[in-house]
């Protein structure tokens, strides 16, 4: 057991306990979904500023028609009018 690799030990445990396969699948799916959501937040959120020199306040460049929420049920962003001054 001391000389076996981690993959071989994992495969042996899965072979002994096949009921763990769905749990490992759901945990992997949850971790993958969480990683993709964090990536979406980092790249699409107006609150995140990656370049402070050229774009110090990225939220000021948003127009009212930009949808940055993950899910907007009752808001139609195409019908909104601009009510803010330009910066």
From Swiss-Prot:
InterPro entries: B12D. Pfam families: B12D. GO terms for cellular component: respiratory chain complex IV. Transmembrane segments: none annotated. It comes from the Eukaryota. Belongs to the complex I NDUFA4 subunit family. This is NADH dehydrogenase [ubiquinone] 1 alpha subcomplex subunit 4-like 2. It comes from Bos taurus.
């Amino acid at each position: 057991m001391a000389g076996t690799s981690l993959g071989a030990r994992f495969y042996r445990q899965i072979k002994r306990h096949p009921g763990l396969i769905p749990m490992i699948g759901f945990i992997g799916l949850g971790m993958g979904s969480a990683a993709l959501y964090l990536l979406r937040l980092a790249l699409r959120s107006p609150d995140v500023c990656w370049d402070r020199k050229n774009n110090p306040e990225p939220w000021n460049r948003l127009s009212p028609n930009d949808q940055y929420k993950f899910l907007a049920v009752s808001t139609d962003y195409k019908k909104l009018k601009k009510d803010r001054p330009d910066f």
